[in-house]
Curated annotation (Swiss-Prot):
PANTHER family: RIBOSOMAL PROTEIN L25/GLN-TRNA SYNTHETASE, ANTI-CODON-BINDING DOMAIN-CONTAINING PROTEIN (PTHR33284), RIBOSOMAL PROTEIN L25_GLN-TRNA SYNTHETASE, ANTI-CODON-BINDING DOMAIN-CONTAINING PROTEIN (PTHR33284:SF1). InterPro entries: Rbsml_bL25/Gln-tRNA_synth_N, Ribosomal_bL25/Gln-tRNA_synth, Ribosomal_bL25_b-dom, Ribosomal_bL25_C, Ribosomal_bL25_long, Ribosomal_L25_dom, Ribosomal_uL5_bac-type. This is Large ribosomal subunit protein bL25. Pfam families: Ribosomal_L25p (PF01386), Ribosomal_TL5_C (PF14693). The gene is rplY.
Length: 197
């Protein structure tokens, strides 16, 4: 995982009016907290931060008054209509420190031939990983799975140094028979019974 370097400026003005002024300057108000330190209020360059946040669990290297600090996004607030960043909460991390994060579950391969549906019971997995080696996602094969099959959290291969932070027996994916096919079979069965009578 690569880190994104951002120049941060300390923020002394607070409140709705100050936040609006900051956003008008194409910057985003943010707060950095963690490790028992007092929260630090900063502003970040809006466009660079928006690009960085496209990567899930991005590691940010913040330059705050000449001091470099590592942080990961904890909460991101966006405008509901226009989608611009309103505020970001960042959690301080250290190299080598373990953190709990959610990673996306991707699938590869095809289900067995037939009309089957793949249900994503969980679209993300909570894992514990080193702050500087957080995986963007995990991938699991669904090749040849048929109706009734399920994939549990423990069945998903994780990168080295990453462990599950949820129940290992949690169902992540399951294969279902298509409803239309079942309805057609039931209708055909009912028609056969009706014709025999």
């Amino acid at each position: 995982m690569s880190e994104v370097k951002l120049a941060a400026e300390p923020r002394t003005e607070f409140g709705k009016g100050a936040a609006r002024r900051i956003r008008r300057e194409s910057k985003v108000p943010a707060v950095v907290y963690g490790h028992g330190a007092e929260p630090v209020h900063i502003t970040l360059p809006g466009h660079e931060l928006l690009l960085a946040l496209r990567t899930p669990n991005v590691l940010l290297s913040l330059d705050i008054e000449g001091k470099a600090q590592l942080a990961i996004p904890k909460a991101v607030q966006r405008d509901a209509i226009k989608g611009f960043l309103e505020h970001v909460d960042l959690l301080l991390v250290r190299s080598g420190e373990k953190v709990n994060v959610e990673v996306y579950v991707h699938t590869e391969g095809d289900l067995a031939p037939g009309a089957y549906l793949l249900e994503h019971v969980l679209s993300t997995l909570t894992v514990e990983a080193e702050a500087t080696h957080i995986p963007e996602s995990v991938t699991v094969s669904i090749e040849g799975l048929e109706a009734g099959a399920s994939i549990l959290a423990k069945d998903i291969p994780l990168p080295s140094g990453t462990t599950l932070a949820i129940d290992e027996d949690a169902v992540v994916l399951q294969v279902l028979a298509a409803q239309a096919e079942e309805a057609a079979e039931e209708a055909a069965g009912t028609a056969e019974v009706g014709s025999e009578a």
